[in-house]
Amino acid sequence: MVRISGFCCAMSLAERQAALLVLADGSVFHGYACGAAGTVIGEVVFNTGMTGYQEVLTDPSYCGQIVSFTYPELGNTGVNPEDEESARPQVSGLIARNVARRHSNWRADRSLPDYLQQHNIVGIYGIDTRALTQHLRSTGAMNGGISTTILDPEELWAEVKAAPSMEGLNLVDQVTTDRPYEWQTPTSQTWEFIEGPTTESLTVVAIDFGVKRNILRRLASYGCRVIVVPADTPIEEILRHEPDGVFLSNGPGDPATVKNGISTAQALLQTGLPLFGICLGHQILGSALGAQTFKLKFGHRGLNHPCGLSQQVEITGQNHGFAIAADSLGPDVEVTHLNLNDRTVAGLRHRHLPVFSVQYHPEASPGPHDSDYLFEQFVALMRDRQPTPVA
């Protein structure tokens, strides 16, 4: 086993509780507890964003993962209810260089450590996250474990090695809604970045594979009536809502395992309805069109990934560990965006059907707003498909 020492943050020795991080390859990181006591196992990944830790922690796409934040300071702005992307934290655990015990933000109602403890999330700080990131970048994302109760590296390592790999894992059932509902949360926030038109009167059915709240906000801000349905909803039930379009949401896990979602997307393609997919929804839509997916070495998780194809580059927020294989796309599918860091497929559309998707997150939260126009494109497809009223 390889022992990698951690750093200490500026706290008294009496306040520190020892914690341990062990990776599947035997690497050991010593640090200090932050949040709940206990042991968690998950896929260890890194996020390079400098802001938006609360949105990351509550993003359902991170279900089953232990997230290491490369930015060294975490928690300075506390936690507030408005910035949550779901009802609770979705990560398995948190890794940080330093976590602020005191926060300064007029919107915050609690500290990050208190929030983690409240929701039973195990965290570790005092870790050399730069060394950890470089290690994961070289070897690839892998399972790991954080513990405040098992401080013997060999014992924790045994638990880590027994855990299933993310590849082949279906986590959608853990994050999808258990019943249909209409999205009704107000969208008029003083800090919202764009005000879209609100007179479309279009109905969108959003298939919830782990949807973020800000996606629903953006759809609603364009005047859409948004009905959210569980991931395994049959197409007959989807069509009963008489949608003008169907949205396939983001979510966690291996897209190849979401068989119900892929078969539903295949059936939706036969209806001619406008379809829009984001992240996991993009992968599911690509799979429904005959493409194959594969696991990335360490994934794309951050707020500054450049995407484009020819004349225009968009800076995007991303969070995924799988991608569509470009050479598996059929002649009827056109690649619209590439991730310009590694040339993986970042967007596609059907040449003859009103169907498109992107691998990244145009809704931001957190992230740049370069790609918000995609919601407008989806609305335009639905509007153009509607019959013209008789005068």
UniProtKB/Swiss-Prot annotation:
The active site is at C279, H361, E363. It is an enzyme of class 6 (ligase). The gene is carA. This is Carbamoyl phosphate synthase small chain. It catalyses: hydrogencarbonate + L-glutamine + 2 ATP + H2O = carbamoyl phosphate + L-glutamate + 2 ADP + phosphate + 2 H(+). It holds the Pfam family GATase. Belongs to the CarA family. Residues 1-199 are annotated as: CPSase. It comes from Synechococcus sp. (strain ATCC 27144 / PCC 6301 / SAUG 1402/1) (Anacystis nidulans).
